[in-house]
C-alpha cells in the first residue's frame, strides 16, 4: 500500500520550532496540573532536533516528554532507527528474536489466528520469528517508514501499510480484518497511546486479541528508558514519549471495550516490560444520567 498522503503544512512561522510542540501544563493522561520534572537535558548531538524535558504527573504517575515532538519530529526520529544489518548482527538482536518467538507462543492458549497485524513492525522481524510458531497465519505490518515495504519485499510480511495505524484511510481499510494485533514497544513512542488502542479495536474482529508490550516504569531501570544510556551519546534524545503505569493502561483498555486476559512481566534485557493480552469485547454501556430530582428548585 502506498504511503498515506499528508497535506503540506508549508514553512513554519517565525520563532516556531518545527520539531517540537508547545509545552503543556497538564497531564495528557488524566488532565492534572500537578507535574514534576524528572529529566531535563541540554542541547547537543541527538536523534531529533531540540531540547527535551520529561515530566511526571503527581496524581496518576504518567511520565511524558514535555514538550513532545511534532509529527515532523517523530518522522525524523523514525527514519533514524538502527539499520537492518546492525539489528541482525548484535547480541541484542539475537535475544530479541528469541523474545519474539516467546511472545508469539503467548497467544497459543487463546486463539489460532488466521490474520495478524504487527503495528510498528519496522523491518518485520517479529512476523518473521512468529511464523515459526504460527506457520498458517498471514502476517501483515504497518509502519510509518519505508522499512515496512522492504519487509514485504523480503517476505517477512504479506501486506505492507506505510503510515500510522490511526490514519483514517488505514483504519477504514483494515476495519474488522484481524484476529490479532500486536504492538511491541510501540505505544510509548506514539503521540496518543489512547488513539492507537482505539484504532486497534477498530481493526480487530469480534473476540480478536490485542498483544501489547510496554516498559514497566515501576521496575529498576524503568525510568531510564527515558534517559540517554549509550557512551558517546550524552545528549541523545530519549526514545519513549510516554511511560504508562500498568494500572492506567489496564483501566484504559477496559474502558475501551477490551477484556484483559493476561498480564506478566517480560523483557529480553533491562528495562523490564509488561506483556498484556486483551480480548476485544462489546463496548461497555454508556453511563446513564440520574433522573432529575423533583424536589430540586
Task: For the regions a language model picked out, list residue spans one by one.
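Hydrophobic/aromatic residues located in beta-strands of well-ordered beta-sheets
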Residues: 139, 210-212
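Feature marks short, surface-exposed loop/turn motifs that line or immediately flank catalytic pockets
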Residues: 148, 207, 218-220, 267-269
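Phosphate-binding active sites in nucleotide-utilizing proteins
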Residues: 189
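A SAM-dependent methyltransferase catalytic signature shared across enzymes that methylate proteins
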Residues: 30-36, 247-264
Amino acid at each position: 500500500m502506498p504511503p498515506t498522503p499528508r497535506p503540506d503544512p508549508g514553512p513554519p512561522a517565525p520563532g516556531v520550532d518545527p520539531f517540537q510542540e508547545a509545552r503543556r501544563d497538564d497531564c495528557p493522561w488524566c488532565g492534572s496540573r500537578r507535574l514534576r520534572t524528572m529529566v531535563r537535558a541540554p542541547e547537543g548531538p541527538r536523534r531529533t532536533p531540540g531540547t527535551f524535558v520529561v515530566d511526571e504527573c503527581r496524581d496518576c504517575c504518567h511520565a511524558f516528554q514535555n514538550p513532545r515532538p511534532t509529527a515532523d519530529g517523530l518522522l525524523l526520529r523514525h527514519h533514524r532507527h538502527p539499520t537492518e544489518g546492525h539489528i541482525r548482527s548484535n547480541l541484542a538482536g539475537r535475544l530479541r528474536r528469541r523474545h519474539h518467538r516467546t511472545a508469539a507462543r503467548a497467544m497459543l492458549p487463546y486463539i489460532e489466528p488466521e490474520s495478524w497485524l504487527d503495528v510498528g513492525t519496522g523491518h518485520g522481524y517479529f512476523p518473521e520469528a512468529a511464523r515459526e510458531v504460527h506457520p498458517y497465519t498471514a502476517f501483515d505490518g504497518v509502519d510509518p517508514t519505508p522499512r515496512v515495504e522492504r519487509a514485504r519485499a523480503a517476505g517477512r510480511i504479506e501486506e505492507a501499510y506505510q503510515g500510522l495505524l490511526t490514519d483514517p484511510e488505514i483504519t477504514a481499510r483494515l476495519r474488522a480484518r484481524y484476529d490479532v494485533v500486536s504492538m511491541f514497544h510501540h505505544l510509548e513512542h506514539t503521540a496518543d497511546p489512547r488513539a492507537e488502542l482505539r484504532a486497534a479495536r477498530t481493526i480487530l474482529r469480534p473476540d480478536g486479541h490485542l498483544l501489547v508490550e510496554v516498559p514497566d516504569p515501576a521496575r529498576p531501570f524503568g525510568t531510564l528508558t527515558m534517559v540517554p544510556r549509550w557512551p558517546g551519546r550524552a545528549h541523545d534524545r530519549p526514545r519513549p514519549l510516554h511511560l504508562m503505569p500498568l494500572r492506567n493502561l489496564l483501566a484504559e483498555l477496559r474502558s475501551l471495550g477490551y477484556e484483559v486476559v493476561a498480564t506478566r512481566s517480560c523483557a529480553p534485557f533491562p528495562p523490564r516490560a509488561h506483556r498484556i493480552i486483551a480480548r476485544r469485547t462489546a463496548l461497555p454501556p454508556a453511563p446513564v444520567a440520574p433522573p432529575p430530582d423533583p424536589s430540586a428548585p
